[in-house]
UniProtKB/Swiss-Prot annotation:
This is one of the proteins that bind and probably mediate the attachment of the 5S RNA into the large ribosomal subunit, where it forms part of the central protuberance. The keyword tRNA-binding does not apply. Keywords: Ribonucleoprotein, Ribosomal protein, RNA-binding, rRNA-binding. One of its GO terms (biological process) is ribosomal large subunit assembly. This is Large ribosomal subunit protein uL18. Part of the 50S ribosomal subunit. Contacts the 5S and 23S rRNAs. Pfam families: Ribosomal_L5e. GO terms for cellular component: cytosolic large ribosomal subunit. It comes from Haloquadratum walsbyi (strain DSM 16790 / HBSQ001). InterPro entries: Rbsml_uL18_euk (IPR005485). HAMAP family: Ribosomal_uL18_A. SUPFAM superfamilies: Translational machinery components. Disulfide bonds: none annotated.
Length: 205
């Protein structure tokens, strides 16, 4: 461990690789709600969060785990599910009167076209104003899962262990997106979090 008069012990959550406090401060200075996008290999989560005197407050949330409520049958950790999760969170944000936000990617790497930016694109398309650079957004064909379907067609064996046919993913995406657009959206704040647990979901997984 480093020592010396100039050495500063990092804050606990930074040592645990969970929170980038410099980034958090920049986001808070914007004065806008944070669109907290967190991804793993299996799931995608999105929340609209504002700071408060007693901790962060989660106003709306969406999780790819709940896309099945709208007919989603494909895996929940890919780009299409990330877009749908962001779109669902965006619709709930508009319903809650939140029409602008800033993207909080936590400690995820800011790689153009990755899942956190696809979540952002979904929220933007739902009507939430989020400052962004167009160069980080994925092609629409990738949002629909056309690259996954093309790969599945080249395989002799099914791509997924489930009964879902990956070659139909783009059409399935279109159907579920239309279902979400036509749905009576509720302001769900339950994405495996409570009022002060946005730090755990709102930081790196």
């Amino acid at each position: 461990m480093a020592t010396g008069p100039r050495y500063k012990v990092p804050m606990r959550r930074r040592r645990e690789v969970r929170t980038d406090y410099h980034q958090r401060l920049r986001l808070l200075k914007s004065g806008k709600p944070r669109l907290v996008a967190r991804v793993s290999n299996r799931h995608v989560r999105a929340q609209l969060i504002t700071p408060g005197p007693d901790g962060d407050e989660t106003h709306v949330a969406a999780s790819s785990e709940h896309l099945s409520e709208y007919g989603w049958e494909a895996p929940t950790g890919n780009l299409p599910s990330a877009y749908l999760t962001g779109y669902l969170a965006g619709m709930r944000a508009i319903e809650a009167g939140l029409d602008e936000a800033v993207l909080d990617i936590g400690l995820n790497t800011a790689t153009p076209g990755n899942k956190v930016f696809v979540v952002q694109e979904g929220a933007i398309d739902a009507g939430v104003s989020i400052p962004h650079n167009e160069s980080v957004l994925a092609d629409w064909s990738r949002n629909r899962g056309e690259h996954i379907a093309a790969y599945a067609e080249q395989r002799d064996e099914p791509l997924y262990n489930s009964d879902f046919d990956a070659t139909t993913l783009p059409e399935h995406f279109d159907t579920v997106l239309e279902t979400i657009q036509d749905a009576d959206i509720t302001m769900n704040t339950d994405a495996d979090t409570d009022n002060n647990n946005s730090q755990s979901v709102g930081d790196n997984e």
